[in-house]
């Protein structure tokens, strides 16, 4: 067996395979199907300072080779997470990471401060694709100023590993990654969903209640792969790649492009065991290519 271990900030992971937020619940939901302790890291669903009801239905739509979602970060808030969910998941033998969202910088900071006190949560992932309600609704992650302000504020309040999840809905994602790195991010993950929409031609109405939503799945992979390659060349912190990873081969491609770890999202809805299959597939690939460690393929793309 090859050495699959990777480091993301202070996180020492047993392998580079993680689950994407919003596609794996709190991990416990999958425990009847697979050995979830084999996964390198589980990123739980988005958590906000206060309870959120989410968007009205319909808020999901299937598309060719993908899906659209506009769930709207439905969750019961960070206090509920700390008091009711954390006690259930804290002893799962893998890294449990919390995805943090907010509608103002102080929301991110307060949420991060609360999670910082949870001993067995070693990292957070900042979702900066959220609209800043104090700045006319523009997402934090679409300008270097917005990225810098939220990352810097959270970094000052949060002492563990800080992962920043980047939006692809920008002109230059490498600039956003550099801004995150300059303001204290330990790692960047990309890509978040692409903005898309679906229309019911007979009704002449949008399918989603919000009109637009986030697109994920196999169709976005070439875009995600290109962005990971660009960002990996632009920063000196570990890059976590995601977007359309449906099998082990996709995962290997992201690592060749420069990702130190990968996240599996939409594929979890299709095959609950996909994470385990990808872990085994990466190991088989390394052995076939005579690699003793997964580090040998990170950024090994020959251009």
From Swiss-Prot:
Pathway: Pyrimidine metabolism; UMP biosynthesis via de novo pathway; orotate from (S)-dihydroorotate (NAD(+) route): step 1/1. The keyword Ribosomal protein does not apply. It is an enzyme of class 1 (oxidoreductase). Its main location: cytoplasm. SUPFAM superfamilies: FMN-linked oxidoreductases. The keyword RNA-binding does not apply. Its cofactor is FMN. GO terms for biological process: 'de novo' pyrimidine nucleobase biosynthetic process; 'de novo' UMP biosynthetic process. Substrate binds at residues 45, 69-73, 127, 192-193. It comes from the Bacteria. One of its GO terms (cellular component) is cytoplasm. It is found in: Cytoplasm. Pfam families: DHO_dh (PF01180). Belongs to the dihydroorotate dehydrogenase family. Type 1 subfamily. This is Dihydroorotate dehydrogenase B (NAD(+)), catalytic subunit.
């Amino acid at each position: 067996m090859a050495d699959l271990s990777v480091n993301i900030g202070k996180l020492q992971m047993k392998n580079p395979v993680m689950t994407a937020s919003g596609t794996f619940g709190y991990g416990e939901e999958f425990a009847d199907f697979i050995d979830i302790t084999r996964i390198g890291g589980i990123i739980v669903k988005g958590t906000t300072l206060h309870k959120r009801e989410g968007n009205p239905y319909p808020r999901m739509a299937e598309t060719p080779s993908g899906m659209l979602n506009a769930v709207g970060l439905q969750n019961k808030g960070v206090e509920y997470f700390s008091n009711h969910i954390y006690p259930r998941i804290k002893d799962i033998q893998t890294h449990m990471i919390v995805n943090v969202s907010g509608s103002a910088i102080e929301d991110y900071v307060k949420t991060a401060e609360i999670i910082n006190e949870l001993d067995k949560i070693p990292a957070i992932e900042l979702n900066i694709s959220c609209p800043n309600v104090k700045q006319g609704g523009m997402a934090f992650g679409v300008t270097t100023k917005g990225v810098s302000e939220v990352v810097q504020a959270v970094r000052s309040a949060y002492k563990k590993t800080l992962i920043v999840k980047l939006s692809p809905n920008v002109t230059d994602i490498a600039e956003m990654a550099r801004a995150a790195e300059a303001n204290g991010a330990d790692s960047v993950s990309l890509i978040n969903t692409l903005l898309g929409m679906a229309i019911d031609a007979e009704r002449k109405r949008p399918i989603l209640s919000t009109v637009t939503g986030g697109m994920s799945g196999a169709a976005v992979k070439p875009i995600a792969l290109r962005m990971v390659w660009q960002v990996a060349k632009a920063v000196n912190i570990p890059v976590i790649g995601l977007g359309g990873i449906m099998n082990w081969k996709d995962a290997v491609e992201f690592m060749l492009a420069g990702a130190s770890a990968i996240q599996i999202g939409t594929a979890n809805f299709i095959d609950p065991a996909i994470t385990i299959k990808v872990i085994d597939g990466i190991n088989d690939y390394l052995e076939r290519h005579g690699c003793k460690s997964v580090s040998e393929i990170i950024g090994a793309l020959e251009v």
